[in-house]
C-alpha cells in the first residue's frame, strides 16, 4: 500500500467517525414518559405544554396513567422509561425485582389526598365509617396509609370498613354520587372539582398521618444507555417545578388549559387552590430514605395486603447524582 493510498484510507476513516459523532449529536434525545392524571403529573404537563422538554433537546413520547403503579407496570412491560409512583408500589416493585431506580421526589401529596363524602351525607368523621364502603385504589400508598394509620387512629380495624377497589380517581365521584359507596379516598384535581360542583365535602386529609412522598423513577435500561436523556428530562421537569413554586398562578393557568382539553371546565382559582396543597421538594433527602426504610419494614411485617419479603437495598435503588447534574451549570 502506498503512502498516498494509506493517507486516503485514514482520511476516509476520520470522515466516517466524525460523521457518526455529528449524527449522534444531532439526533434528539428521546424518552417515553408516563404522566399521572392527578396533580403528581402537573410538572410533566407543564413541561410538555410550555415546551421545556423540547428546549432541552428532548423528544417525549407520553401517555397518561391514573395510578403510579399502572405506570410502574408499563415500565415492566418495556412501554415507558420514566414514571412517578408512590412509595408503596415503588417498594413492592423493588421486592418483585422491577429494574428501576428513583432519581428524585416527585412531590409530597398528603395535602391533596382527602377522605370525602357526598355533600348531603351525615358522615362527619372517619370514626363513622364503621360498616361503610370507602372507595379506594388497591395496592397504593393511599390504601396502605388508610388501613394502617387512618383507621387505627379512630379505633377502627381494617376489616371493619369495606374498601371496594376503584382504581381511577375520576370514577370515584360518580360512585359516590350514585351511593354505591359511602366515602372515598380522593386526590386533586378531583377533590377541588367535586367541591366546586357541590358534589362532595372533605372530612379528613392524610397529612395528619403521613407526608406521602411520590417517587420519580426511571428504568435501569435508560439509566445505563441514555443518562443524558434522563438529565434532560429532569432539567425540563425542574423548570416546571420552579414555575409551580415561583409563579403558581401561571402554573395553574397552564394546568387549567389541560383540564379544558379533557372536557373539564374548571375556574383557574379552583385549580390554583388545589395546586397550593401540594409540596414540591425534589431532593431525595436522608429523611426520605429513612421514610422508605421504615415503610419497607412495615410492609415486611405484612399487617395488610401488599407486604414484601425483605427490606430492599435502597442504596442501589436511589440515585441522587442525575438530579444534582440537572441542577448544575451546563
Kindly give the residue locations of the regions a language model identified.
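Bacterial N-terminal signal peptides that target proteins for export
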Residues: 1-10
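Bacterial N-terminal signal peptides
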Residues: 9-19
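Short, glycine-/small- and polar/acidic-enriched structural segments
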Residues: 25-159, 163-166, 172-175, 182-188, ...
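Predominant activation on well-ordered alpha-helical scaffold segments within soluble catalytic domains
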Residues: 45, 91, 148, 192, ...
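Short amphipathic alpha-helical segments at helix boundaries and their inter-helical linkers
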Residues: 80, 177, 278-290, 322-330
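Pocket-lining segment of extracytoplasmic ligand-binding domains
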Residues: 88, 121, 170-261
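Secondary-structure end/capping motifs
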Residues: 224-306
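Conserved C-terminal helix/tail region of periplasmic/extracytoplasmic solute-binding proteins
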Residues: 296-330
Amino acid at each position: 500500500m502506498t503512502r498516498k493510498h494509506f493517507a486516503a484510507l485514514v482520511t476516509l476513516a476520520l470522515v466516517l467517525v466524525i460523521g457518526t459523532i455529528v449524527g449522534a449529536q444531532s439526533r434528539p434525545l428521546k424518552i417515553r414518559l408516563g404522566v399521572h392524571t392527578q396533580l403528581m403529573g402537573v410538572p410533566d404537563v407543564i413541561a410538555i405544554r410550555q415546551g421545556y422538554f423540547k428546549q432541552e433537546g428532548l423528544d417525549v413520547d407520553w401517555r397518561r396513567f391514573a395510578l403510579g403503579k399502572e405506570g410502574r407496570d408499563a415500565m415492566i412491560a418495556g412501554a415507558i422509561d420514566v414514571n412517578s409512583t408512590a412509595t408503596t408500589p415503588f417498594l413492592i416493585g423493588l421486592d418483585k425485582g422491577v429494574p428501576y431506580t428513583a432519581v428524585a421526589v416527585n412531590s409530597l401529596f398528603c395535602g391533596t389526598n382527602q377522605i370525602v363524602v357526598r355533600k348531603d351525607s351525615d358522615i362527619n368523621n372517619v370514626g363513622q365509617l364503621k360498616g361503610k364502603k370507602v372507595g379506594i385504589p388497591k395496592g397504593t400508598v393511599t390504601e396502605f396509609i388508610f388501613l394502617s394509620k387512618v383507621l387505627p387512629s379512630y379505633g377502627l380495624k381494617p376489616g371493619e370498613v369495606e374498601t371496594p377497589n376503584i382504581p381511577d380517581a375520576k370514577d370515584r365521584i360518580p360512585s359516590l354520587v350514585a351511593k354505591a359507596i359511602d366515602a372515598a379516598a380522593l386526590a386533586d384535581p378531583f377533590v377541588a372539582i367535586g367541591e366546586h360542583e357541590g358534589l362532595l365535602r372533605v372530612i379528613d386529609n392524610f397529612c395528619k398521618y403521613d407526608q406521602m412522598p411520590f417517587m420519580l423513577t426511571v428504568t435501569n435500561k435508560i439509566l445505563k444507555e441514555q443518562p443524558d436523556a434522563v438529565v434532560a428530562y429532569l432539567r425540563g421537569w425542574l423548570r416546571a417545578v420552579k414555575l409551580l413554586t415561583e409563579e403558581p398562578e401561571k402554573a395553574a393557568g397552564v394546568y387549567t388549559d389541560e383540564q379544558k382539553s379533557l372536557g373539564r371546565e374548571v375556574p383557574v382559582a379552583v385549580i390554583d387552590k388545589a395546586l397550593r396543597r401540594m409540596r414540591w421538594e425534589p431532593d431525595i433527602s436522608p429523611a426520605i430514605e429513612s421514610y422508605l426504610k421504615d415503610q419497607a419494614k412495615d410492609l415486611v411485617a405484612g399487617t395488610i395486603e401488599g407486604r414484601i419479603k425483605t427490606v430492599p437495598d435502597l442504596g442501589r435503588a436511589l440515585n441522587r447524582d442525575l438530579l444534582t447534574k440537572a441542577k448544575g451549570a451546563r
